[in-house]
Amino acid sequence: PPAAKAIIVLGSGVINGQPSPTLANRLDRAAPVVLAQPNAKLVLTGGVDFAETESEAAVMSRYLQQRYNIPTAQIILEDQSTSTELNLQNSQALLSAQQISTQQPIVIITSDFHTLRAAAIAKKQGYNQVSMLGATTPLGTRYNAWLREYFAYGSGWLLNEYWLGNSPNQAQRSLAM
């Protein structure tokens, strides 16, 4: 990926205080990118799951620090969100506080099955220079993940989560027809 001002890793579940296999793959995909770009801010996204006491973002941070020695000064925790849309929306304010705008180069790391929908949401929210990187989905969850994402993409289209054209209102007009 090109030199980035920020790298955003989207959450994907925590199990007993540890990253889920899908989330661990995202973090393992992110680590070399982060290490190669020490001046880029790293935003780790995800709030507290109903069955957990610690946010996904905090678990992600601990994993990257322990396994890859990612410096805490590079990490920003977005620990309030519960969806892709909120991950990216909340990250904007945190990046803005660091004088980083959505007009600057940003890398978003998620799972391979999730890149299309995440890119569409990012575009609608004004992220204009995004590079998407997809981590491999663990074989045991791959088919369920792809099926779930298929329906999530359709649902997002109906809920107008994506920017489908040259103007933000075009998506609303196409839904009204």
Please identify what each model-predicted range represents:
Residues 1-147:
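A structural signal for short, hydrophobic/glycine-enriched beta-strand patches
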Residues 50-56, 152-159, 175-176:
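A general structural signal for short secondary-structure boundary/capping elements
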Residues 142-166:
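A transmembrane-helix-recognition feature enriched in membrane-embedded lipid enzymes
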Residues 164-177:
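Short linear elements at protein peripheries
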